[in-house]
Amino acid sequence: MKYRISDLKREIRIALDQNKSSEPLRDLGDIDTLSFDDIVGSKIADAAKIVILHAPIHLLGSGIPFGKGIEWKSAEGHGSGSVLLPDDFLRLVVFQMSDWSRAVSEAISPSDAQYALQSSRFPGVRGCPQKPVVAIVNTGVGMMLEFYSCTGGEGVGIKQATYIPKPRILDETIELSHKIKDAVVYYSAYMVAVTMGQREQAQQLLNISQSLLNDTTL
């Protein structure tokens, strides 16, 4: 859902209990020439990114499809493969190959102990169609999603693959799942309070943002 930045700024100011959106800041060093409104606006995209990375997956929506081409490590439909991720990739929503019994929403990284197991000579410890594993790695051509693994042979392909992109402000709007919008507002307010040196207020706002992400009614 698209939200207007002006509307989000207003909600952030309400969260901070501020009424004057253009009041200049004082005694804040290099940023004392910025208006309060400028500082509020500068936090929204970063706050959205952090919230997206930490939110439960069911709050993020269905995501955007990806995965136009597969690179197989050996033969098509056998073993592991990889898919180039979009440049604006931020978080995986779901990935499933057509011969897998279930989808995967949590990816590992090369620093995880489980990643080394995917190269083991013992097949029982590697990912398989019944217990699939995906990893996100940085390569010379960009970020890749590696999947482990397939046994279905020729004709195996991607059944479903979606992701959440990095949040960007375009035409004074930002795309957010409606289920995380309030958490983004309070996290933005938290970041503003930190900038203003209001530590106690910042902690309260952070607690509210985190509690919104843990709300089981969403």
Outline where the language-model segments fall.
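Glycine-enriched, solvent-exposed interface loops adjoining structured elements
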Residues: 1-218
